[in-house]
Amino acid sequence: MSLIEFPLLDQTSSNSVISTTLKDLSNWSRLSSLWPLLYGTSCCFIEFASLIGSRFDFDRYGLVPRSSPRQADLILTAGTVTMKMAPSLVRLYEQMPEPKYVIAMGACTITGGMFSTDSYSTVRGVDKLIPVDVYLPGCPPKPEAVIDALTKLRKKISREIVEDRTLSQKKNRCFTTSHKLYVRRSTNTGTYEQELLYQSPSTLDISSETFFKSKSPVSSYKLVN
């Protein structure tokens, strides 16, 4: 190569060479190829299934659904989580390789939904079992909301550092896999203490003189006024 061709090389190299860091390259590759593990237990999963069709086409985001947690880096929980399902959900999360992310989809997953008031077997929030990165409220959320949640997760991935995320999860998170059920007496049975409702005749027949003698001395002027 002659010396005359060097200026031409300098002009074309600025458009063909990209300078970046290994962290940015890793984040870019991860946010562009999320492989979700679909943990659907209720009607919210039907809304997510509509993303597979041609109308929304979630393949354009690089999503490839996986059936094995060892090949997934995103778990999407949709629907009610019961006490019996809690250990299996935690095990699936632990089998996923780092870095891994969680999207809680629907009111039943986030707070227990309508089953959280009277049900004895519903987990009141999946974040009591595994750490959640994006909360997606709704009953059920629309497919457009799911796309918005995925976009927010992609933005979060593009700004993070893998080492800092792993250390923060080890220090600040505490997972609970065992749920104990304590049977207590109900407060709405309709039976009450009879002593509080009905006083005995001995307490009702107390004269006024005896009553005032047991109390502190009060003048008649104070009683009248």
From Swiss-Prot:
UniProt-recorded name of the protein: NAD(P)H-quinone oxidoreductase subunit K, chloroplastic
Recorded catalytic activity of this chain's protein: a plastoquinone + NADH + (n+1) H(+)(in) = a plastoquinol + NAD(+) + n H(+)(out); a plastoquinone + NADPH + (n+1) H(+)(in) = a plastoquinol + NADP(+) + n H(+)(out)
PROSITE patterns reported for this sequence: COMPLEX1_20K (PS01150)
Binding site for [4Fe-4S] cluster: C43, C44, C108, C139
Keywords: 4Fe-4S, Chloroplast, Iron, Iron-sulfur, Membrane, Metal-binding, NAD, NADP, Plastid, Plastoquinone, Quinone, Thylakoid, Translocase, Transport
Gene3D superfamilies, alphabetized: 3.40.50.12280
UniProt xrefs under InterPro entries: NADH_UbQ_OxRdtase-like_20kDa, NADH_UQ_OxRdtase_20Kd_su
Membrane-topology annotation of the record: Peripheral membrane protein
Assembly and oligomerization: NDH is composed of at least 16 different subunits, 5 of which are encoded in the nucleus.
GO MF terms held by the record: 4 iron, 4 sulfur cluster binding; iron ion binding; NADH dehydrogenase (ubiquinone) activity; quinone binding
Annotated organism of origin: Oryza sativa subsp. indica
Comment on bound cofactor: Binds 1 [4Fe-4S] cluster.
